[in-house]
Amino acid sequence: MVDIIVDFEIKYKDAMARVGKFKTPHGTVTTPALMPVVHPGKQTLDVKKLGAQIVITNSYIIYKNEELKKKALEEGVHSLIDFPNTIETDSGSFQLSVYGDIDITNEEVIKFQEAIKTDIGTSLDIPTAPYVKREEAENDLEITIERAKEAANVKSDLLLNSVVQGSTFPDLREKCAKEISKYDADIYPIGAVVPLMEMYRYADLVDAVMYSMRGLPENKPRHLMGAGHPMVFALATAMGCDLFDSAAYILYANKDRFMMPDGTLRLEDLIEMPCSCRVCCEYTVDELKQMDQKKRAKLIAEHNLHISFAEIRRIRQAIVDGELMKLVELRCRSHPFLLDGLRRLMEYKEDMERLNPSSKKSAFFYTGYESLARSEVPKHLKQLENIKPKNKNLVILPHTRKPYTKYVNREYIKKYTPKIPTYYSNTTNTDYSNSDVVVADIPFGIIPLGLDEFYPLAQNESPSIHDLDSKRFIRDIINNYSKKYDNVLIHRKVIEKFDITNFNLIEDELQLPEAKISDFNRLNDIADYQFGCGAGNALFGGDEDKITIEKSRKTKKIRHVFEDNENIVNMRANDGFLILSDLGAKRLHKFLEYPHNRVVVSEDSEPFALKGKSVFNKFVLDCDENIRRNDEVLIVNKDDKLLAFGKALLSSYEIKDFNTGQAIKTRKWKKEIE
């Protein structure tokens, strides 16, 4: 028996999406990837030339056709369909769902797929239609699970798909995913969702996918079966789907339909060709209409594949740039029912956040109230609790240009005129000279001045004309945050913008604070926000006189922090994160209780970690569940001895599941650790 195991590695992350690579006997596939459906006896398009790294064909059709079967057994499926790269084969489950029965067993179809030398084979699952009775779904599920187990035992020279079923019962989807994961398949398709997409039930599709994801491992690719329209690719990718298969490109073409990233166009309605692909550049609408139907269908199918592959490429780039959710929101606004799907996805904020990177290359653009559910917003509100009040008074100012510390003092403090009532308060107090100062803004609500250069609080934009949902959201944040203070003073613009009540106009002269923050206090706020309450004091000791701060000559931002000429931390220029140095790592390790911020490595990995070598996933024994990609982490052994420190390349959940690839990019000790 040849033990073939999928080798999958994540390269880039955004939301739950992954740009990754997995190896097969016939090549490496970059995900997300589209698998065009290739009919074993009818294919006319060169899908490899159009961009296909991987295709899917039906082993049952080959099995039932004696001529195709003979050639496949003698020459292999790659020769049969003339495709040299990775091939996945379906098992006949689709025919089973259509005709109710097929004349091949689960074991036979696995053995046949091995015999024709496919790269990825599929067990004979039971596709359960949406909205069936629960008893039927449960019975089908048990058969699917049993067949997944049988396939894992039977297969040898084959990468194996195990399909998640469960109809429209979310708990059954999760149960199936957990059960089939026990048998360590190589890829996990999510099946029987085509009817949901055909009925535009995208909210139910999101439930089916997200509950499936809860039970699936992070270290294997996931395939959304039958998802062939480019308008759904971005949403599905954001949920963690890596592979898609499409017969839609030819099915739509046969009906003179042009697929686009935001919908479908009918040839009969067009006066201009819709894109800049070869077909649309070389042919006019009238020429296509006058053409033989078969030739026309082939050309439209080529257009459809071009659009589909272009969308996959755009999604990959959006993941690399940290802009996937902006693209998802754009795509989902192309159809009301897709927007239903996005709004249902908002209910899975915790699932999304645990896999979302802490920092990204691109700014956060607020495009509608759905943006409020993006992982960055709830994470900020959670981390905001790490910063405790320093005074009993709070002053809330409107947003200005960024960074706020450069402009709010000039705009709202120095321009204050006692004769013109400008502020509202919850008390009669007029002395706010000693106050915490924050800015109220969409989408993050409350931004302390010390965090105004930290990602994503410094890197975000929202429209100047605000929607009611965001106003209500920010108002609730302001009201809850204000409860921490005895006296709260709010600028009139904030009161009016967010319709805040229960605050009275102050007509007496006020003593206002200077809306600035010292570099030392900024460092403490960032440390508390990034690592946990009290981390600032642990790192910097509470004595400002002992700390030396070096700034960039060009930007005037903090770059390096020292105590007695020994580097504690550095500040990353692009996102404001604190990067630990030797002394900072030691102090943070001493302060934080186990397992906070820690990655525990095996004994074999200890000497390499001490030398500053990267930590690989297979050597990680445990890690703090709150670790996210791009976080600064401490590397320790099982006895909690500090070995090294560095940047996480994956979230804790991914680190625990993966046995290949890097987990931590380790920073080298400047001095040998004691």
UniProtKB/Swiss-Prot annotation:
Its cofactor is Zn(2+). Its EC number is 2.4.2.48. It is an enzyme of class 2 (transferase). Exchanges the guanine residue with 7-cyano-7-deazaguanine (preQ0) at position 15 in the dihydrouridine loop (D-loop) of archaeal tRNAs. It comes from Methanosphaera stadtmanae (strain ATCC 43021 / DSM 3091 / JCM 11832 / MCB-3). CDD domains: PUA_archaeosine_TGT. The keyword rRNA processing does not apply. Binds 1 zinc ion per subunit. GO terms for biological process: tRNA wobble guanine modification. The active site is at residue 90. Pathway: tRNA modification; archaeosine-tRNA biosynthesis. Zn(2+) binds at residues 275, 277, 280. This is tRNA-guanine(15) transglycosylase. Signal peptide: none annotated. GO terms for cellular component: cytoplasm. Substrate binds at residues 125, 192. Gene3D superfamilies: ArcTGT, C2 domain, PUA domain, Queuine tRNA-ribosyltransferase-like, Uracil-DNA glycosylase-like. One of its GO terms (molecular function) is zinc ion binding. Belongs to the archaeosine tRNA-ribosyltransferase family.
